C-alpha cells in the first residue's frame, strides 16, 4: 500500500459520522509523502517549528501553531508525541512517528 492510499482510504474516510477535512503524511524533513487534495500548502519553517516543539514541548504555545499560514492555538497534547491546535470550531492534530508527521485538519460537526 502506498502512503497516498493510506491517506485516501484511512485518514480521509468517515468514522462514526466524522471525517477530516484534509490530511497528510510529511517527512520530518518537510518532504511530502502523501496528502489529500485539500491539504494546505505549508512553509518549511512551519514544519521546523512543529519539529522543534516535539523536541522542546511548549515552544509553540506562546506563538501558536501555523500550518499553511493558518494560526492554531496550541491546546493540550502529548509531549513529544502529539500536538493539538484549535481554531474556531475546527483544529489540527499532529502525530510524530519515527520518520514522519501525520497531520489531520478537521472542522467540528
From Swiss-Prot:
Listed InterPro entries: PFN (IPR048278), PFN_euk (IPR005455), PFN_sf (IPR036140), Profilin_CS (IPR027310)
Molecular function in Gene Ontology: actin monomer binding
CDD domains (alphabetical): PROF
Entry keyword Disulfide bond: yes
A GO term from the CC aspect: cell cortex
Domain of life: Eukaryota
Subunit structure: Multimer. Occurs in many kinds of cells as a complex with monomeric actin in a 1:1 ratio.
Protein's UniProt name: Profilin
Lineage of the species this protein comes from: Eukaryota, Viridiplantae, Streptophyta, Embryophyta, Tracheophyta
Amino acid at each position: 500500500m502506498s502512503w497516498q492510499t493510506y491517506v485516501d482510504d484511512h485518514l480521509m474516510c468517515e468514522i462514526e459520522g466524522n471525517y477530516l477535512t484534509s490530511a497528510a503524511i510529511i517527512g520530518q524533513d518537510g518532504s511530502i509523502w502523501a496528502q489529500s487534495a485539500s491539504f494546505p500548502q505549508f512553509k518549511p519553517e512551519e514544519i521546523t517549528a512543529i519539529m522543534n516543539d516535539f523536541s522542546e514541548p511548549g515552544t509553540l504555545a506562546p506563538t501558536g501553531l501555523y500550518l499553511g499560514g493558518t494560526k492554531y492555538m496550541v491546546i493540550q497534547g502529548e509531549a513529544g508525541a502529539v500536538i493539538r491546535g484549535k481554531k474556531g470550531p475546527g483544529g489540527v492534530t499532529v502525530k510524530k512517528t519515527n520518520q514522519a508527521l501525520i497531520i489531520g485538519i478537521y472542522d467540528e460537526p
